[in-house]
Amino acid sequence: MFKQISKSPLCFRLENTGARKLYLSAGIHGDETSGPHTLINLLKEPEFFDDLDVTIFPILNMYGHKHNQRHNEADKDLNRDFKSQKEKETQDHIKLMNDRYDIALCLHEGRDADGVYIYKPNKNKRLDVMESILKAMTLQMPIDDRHKRMHSLVEPGILQDVKYKEMHETEAIYLANRGVDAFTIEVPHGYSMNVREKTLRAGIKQAVRILS
């Protein structure tokens, strides 16, 4: 059973001593709703995680989530704050990130996307893990094809995080810089909530299989 270990930010832990560790987060951009929806539902399904040790942050930007806006109350993008750590939400979040996770998935939505894709931090070399998770997600929806001509494209559906993100440190980059196999998975906002949730669950379940 998941236990709540913090109210601000919301954080839940499924503790299994000695097991491999999975980190999941969503809602750092308040107008991206399928990630929080998916993780809140998964909190009711501890059996989904096959005896892993799991940490879940379902809604990292509570103000943005309540007001359906990307930024926090101070109009700051929390996913560009991990280098400076100026925002209280980021400071409180980092205090709870005290484990060496085996895999970390940061759940996001792409507003203009037409399929799934993954952002790869520079420090993360585990393309095999990303490819496996992306493949599982594509059973629910196609790979986004907007990035074919972008220099940041590593391979179809996997993009290198750009220098701006590396400079300011997104959540995934912060984790990757500390030795975690972390990356951002994105689903398109234009699909129904049901399909977005199924796609995110498929990616998470593949991460569970990799670690089990």
PLM features per residue range, with description:
Residues 1-212:
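Structured catalytic-domain cores with a bias toward divalent-metal coordination
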